[in-house]
Amino acid sequence: MIKYLQSHLEEQGYLFVTLPKPDLAPLQLLTEYKGHLEEYDGSLLDLFEPDGSPFPIRDRQLPNFSGQQLLQTDWSAGADLLHGLFKLFQQKEDKLKASLSGMKGLVLSFAYENIEEERVSEQALDNFLAGAMPKKEGFQRSVERLQDGELYVLTSVMRSNQFTVTIDCQREDQGKLEAAVAEIVDAHASIERKQSNSFSLQTEGEQAFVFACRAAQVLYNKKQWFQFWKKDKDGFRIEKREGMVVRGEEDFSVQPLQAPSGLLKL
């Protein structure tokens, strides 16, 4: 399981994506399963009749987050995350675990560069849902999840096209670590070595991946479910959800790190 420290992102209501993905976007649906959010087929607009006022998707640069260490893990989880990032960047990862395994106390810290946020107004979304009518076709498959409070919608995604990982270990393994990082860099032409124990990898062209997001729970304010198709003052709404993570079927589960008090927050 991945273990992570509380970060600036969590403090501002963002959720981590366990293995960064290129295809997440605002208004995409998620479903809750065993305390995690997972991808769910379709968009919110597939479930409701349009009201003639499209949601503008806005982009903004987030320089304050670029270069910050946003995620820190131990080796047992960091190896999986690094392995997933290498696959996303279409890099061979065969030497990755072999080069770094066996050292004691490995800690991996991840930073992302060139961060952009793609978002939709949560207020506009909530206003839309307050009077929205479900589509009779295609909505029924989601009714049960909605009744159980398991349906979520993405309101914001953070994208990056470059990451830097810094690896720390116990002092007696420092020489081995520097040699291992050199071996990894030598095996991958796209990797740039930053310091003795850190390296950076950037995607080619404009391709970017989503590593964090915001999500809101879709709720329904009506006592009787058979009144779904009647339009009155009651209706749908969203509620922000924090403290969860987003994963796909191939991802590993995530738990917060039980950190001692006074531990530095990243």
Curated annotation (Swiss-Prot):
Tagged with keyword Nucleotide-binding: no
Transmembrane segments annotated in the record for this chain: 65-81, 93-113, 162-181, 187-203
Alphabetical UniProt keywords: Antiviral defense, Cell membrane, Cytoplasm, Membrane, Transmembrane, Transmembrane beta strand
GO CC terms, sorted: cytoplasm; plasma membrane
Residue numbers marked as site, Cleavage: R247, G248
Region (C-terminal region): 248-266
GO terms (BP aspect): defense response to virus
Note: Might be a Bacteriodetes scaffold.
Written domain comment of the UniProt record: The N-terminus has marked structural similarity to the mammalian gasdermin N-terminal domain. The C-terminal region wraps around the twisted beta sheet core, probably stabilizing the inactive state. The beta-stranded transmembrane 'fingers' of the active protein form by local refolding of several alpha helices found only in the inactive state.
Annotated family: Belongs to the bacterial gasdermin family.
Descriptive protein name: Gasdermin bGSDM
Organism: Unknown prokaryotic organism
Lineage: Bacteria, environmental samples
